[in-house]
Amino acid sequence: IEELKQKVKNINIMNEKNTTLNIVPPLHFIITDTSGHTVAVEPHNGLLIVKDNHVKVLTNAPKLEWHIQNLRNYAFLQPEKSTNQLVGKVLVRSMGCEAGTNGLPGGYTSTERFVRATYLRHHLSSSHNEDINLMNCFKILDSVSIPQGAVLDAGETHYTQYQLVMESKDKAYYIKPYFSNQLFKVQLNEELLSKDDMTSVSYTHLRAHE
C-alpha cells in the first residue's frame, strides 16, 4: 500500500470500453495488501486519490466519505435481537432473533448495497478454514448482486454479470459468472504478473442447471 501511495501519481486511467459491460465504467478501486491494509483509490479532478478504507467496502458512487457518513444512520443494526421495552405498563417484546437487522436497506442502489455489504463484512463469522471464508465472501456478494430484470436502464436489464473474490496471500482470483454457480480460479503467476498488455482468460460456459 505504501508503494501504491508513492506511485499512484504515475498511473493514468484509460477511457476504454469494458468489452463485457460495453461501457466505460466509472470505476473506483479497492486494494488490500497481504497485511490486510485496505485503501480506496478514487478519481478526483483528473487525479487518482488514495484513501484509507477502514470499513473495507467500496461501491462506485458516491465518494467513500459520503458512504462512511451515511453509516451513522444505521448504527442501530446488530446481529442480536433488540431488547424488550416497557412502554407504560405494556411490555413490548422483540419480534425475534432477526429483529436487530430491522432497517437494513434492501434496495439495489449503491448506497443501500454499501450498507448491506458493510454489515455482513463485519458480522459474518470468520474461520481458520479458507474455503469457508471464500464462501462467506460470495455470500456477501450474493446479497448485493442484481438479478436480471430487477433493475432496468432505458428498458435494458441492468444486472450483476459476475462476482469475483481475490485471495491476496495466494494471489488467486475466484470468479462466478451470472449463469453458473461454479467457481473458476485464475492463479496470478509470474507470467501473468509480468504482462504489459490486457490479458483475457477463457472458461467453459455451463448451462444454468449444470
Label every PLM stretch briefly.
Residues T204-E210:
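Conserved small/polar residues in nucleotide/adenosyl-binding loops
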Residues T38-E80, T101-L104:
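Phosphate-rich cofactor/ligand-interacting catalytic cores and adjacent structured alpha/beta frameworks
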Residues Y74-L124:
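Long, charge-rich alpha-helical interaction segments
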Residues L104-I175:
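Extended, compositionally biased non-globular segments
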Residues S200-S202:
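Acidic, proline/serine/threonine- and glycine-rich low-complexity intrinsically disordered segments
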Residues I1-H54:
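Structured, non-membrane catalytic/scaffold regions adjacent to prosthetic-group chemistry
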Residues A172-D197:
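C-terminal soluble interaction/assembly domains
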Residues T32-G36, H44, T101, L120-H122, ...:
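Short, flexible beta-strand-to-coil junctions
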